[in-house]
Amino acid sequence: MGDWSALGRLLDKVQAYSTAGGKVWLSVLFIFRILLLGTAVESAWGDEQSAFVCNTQQPGCENVCYDKSFPISHVRFWVLQIIFVSTPTLLYLAHVFYLMRKEEKLNRKEEELKMVQNEGGNVDMHLKQIEIKKFKYGLEEHGKVKMRGGLLRTYIISILFKSVFEVGFIIIQWYMYGFSLSAIYTCKRDPCPHQVDCFLSRPTEKTIFIWFMLIVSIVSLALNIIELFYVTYKSIKDGIKGKKDPFSATNDAVISGKECGSPKYAYFNGCSSPTAPMSPPGYKLVTGERNPSSCRNYNKQASEQNWANYSAEQNRMGQAGSTISNTHAQPFDFSDEHQNTKKMAPGHEMQPLTILDQRPSSRASSHASSRPRPDDLEI
């Protein structure tokens, strides 16, 4: 028989990406089929045609009678069965290799983007997309196989085809020569001159091997059915439990720096953005109750720069107690999708900014209030 090392190496790689039932099935395939077929079975059928003797001297009669009794050798039939049954598993392995290649490309792209990010480039959104794709194409999670999506469908289809091939080969074997061998075969076929009797060597030994291989096929079929029900039940159970969507989980876990640095993100999380209205000395901004831990260390340098700009502006104006400019007093102009605060959690609704004047009235303000203005009404 040929060398099974190439097929063995390929099937050995499937062990890392199979369930417990799949690993047991591969063990049955290796131990009770490939190894047994390469050692004991081949030696038992080594002389099947040479030891097939008919009681006639007619040339060619033994050959045609052997062809009628055994359309295909049992050994070659079982080799075909192993190849057909292993093909769906190899196709599943090809899908696994495809996903591994996708993951390698994403890793290389992520390294390139991180190098760009270290140089000051803004690639946060691209890194977030790569994280989502890696979650989709990833193969291992906490040491376990992540079998979902297309990979799960491929695995279920491979189990179905393996089961169909097992049933098909069992039916074909029963149709061609049954599950036992007789010691005498009667043949009446040209060029035999009359009905002749042909004798088979070691029929009992060969019958034992036939039954053994039949039992192995039935066990393999049962493992496939059990694994199919288990995988289907597991996927349905996960769907009923309403597991969190992996993409939304990834979106929550991976928040880009661009969004965290935006004024809208800061406002809705209770943080002061660099472009938010500033309160001059003596004033206090009230924005509602927020979580102080989420605002910690938020754009500290930008806030200091804004205060420096504000002080410079006040010095240029020469008015120590001037009111807040209209530029700083303008409300936020958010897009429509952020103005609906009904969807926010209770206790975190947006509250309008209110300015509490806690400073004492100054002389400058009193004099400024008594100065006549052009638009005042005369009494």
From Swiss-Prot:
Lineage of producing organism: Eukaryota, Metazoa, Chordata, Craniata, Vertebrata
Membrane topology, Extracellular segments: 45-76, 185-207
SMART domains reported for this sequence: CNX, Connexin_CCC
SUPFAM superfamilies: Connexin43
Alphabetical keyword list: Cell junction, Cell membrane, Disulfide bond, Gap junction, Membrane, Transmembrane, Transmembrane helix
Originating organism: Xenopus laevis
Listed GO CC annotations: apical plasma membrane; cell junction; connexin complex; intercalated disc; mitochondrion; nucleus; plasma membrane
Role this protein plays: One gap junction consists of a cluster of closely packed pairs of transmembrane channels, the connexons, through which materials of low MW diffuse from one cell to a neighboring cell. Plays an essential role in gap junction communication in the ventricles.
Protein encoded by which gene: gja1
The protein's name in its UniProt record: Gap junction alpha-1 protein
Transmembrane is among the record's keywords: yes
